[in-house]
Swiss-Prot record:
Keyword presence, Secreted: yes
Modification sites for Leucine amide: L8
GO (cellular component) term, any one: extracellular region
Localization annotation: Secreted
Protein source organism: Rhodnius prolixus (Triatomid bug)
The protein's name in its UniProt record: Allatostatin-2
Gene Ontology biological-process annotations: neuropeptide signaling pathway
Length: 8
């Protein structure tokens, strides 16, 4: 699973 920056 890739690391995505959603800024939650």
């Amino acid at each position: 699973m890739r690391n995505y920056s959603f800024g939650l």
